[in-house]
Amino acid sequence: MIEIDGLTKRYGDKTAVDDLSFVVEPGVVTGFLGPNGAGKSTTMRMIAGLDRPTSGTVRVNGKHFPKAPAPMAELGILLDARSVHPGLSARNNLLALARTAGIGRRRVDEVIELAGLGEVAGSRAGGFSLGMGQRLGVAAALLGQPQTVVLDEPVNGLDPDGVRWIRLLLKSLAAEGRTVLVSSHLMSEMAQTATQLVVLGRGKLISQGSVEDFTAHATGTGVLVRTPETTRLGQLLAAPGITVINDGTDQLRVSGTTAEQIGTAAWQAHLPVYELTPTHASLEEAFMQITQDSIEYHAGATR
């Protein structure tokens, strides 16, 4: 479990993380989202004990990390896959790290196979592609069989097979009861991997909860209704809290009520309905809506 309470980090007059409080529970994959500059990496560095908070506290499994007696068994973290010795092989990088924590060769061999590095374990890490470097970074993070795993953009540079491997790995770690916090800019992948979300904007917490709840409150979630009586049905459904959009065709887009309630109202009024389809905003759409005021640089219009 990760417990963050009142966490603040300032660099001079710039506040990177601002009074942040949230809990990451074990047994689920939690996505850590936010636009560039939101404070995600700074928060992860404070979780790892690499940056000292200006104020506030971080606890990992109830302890102030890295003061735990066996820190690699408490927290496995990947912040930068390039943080390896380029002149050493993948195996020797892992062996060197293992020695610092009293971890044996057998566990090194296990994480090499787990990360799919068996064929390149003897190759210099400096010659690895970004994707292979990510695999090595994940192997290092899992070396101590940690109860909590924090990964910053682990799918960067991975091919589709590697992305799927990360997805299944994170889910299996969560299924074992571990705490898993992962950041990514790939919303489609996060939608398939995470069940809980923590969303930052300009250093502040702007949302926390399930992926389902996050997307349910976004514009685009509702019911698509197809009927030749759009005007009459739209008038019938008009009520506080219900939005009806008529695009001039035989379709209505309705939010604030359910398909069952719409169908019942149409049946009682003897209005024909040809289609009732619940619609859901994608995670990307919901993310863009909730963070639009927290983006430092907006893209220009496309042609």
Predicted regions and their residues:
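Residues at or immediately flanking beta-strands
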Residues: 57, 222, 272-275
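ABC transporter nucleotide-binding domains
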Residues: 2-4, 9-182, 187-201
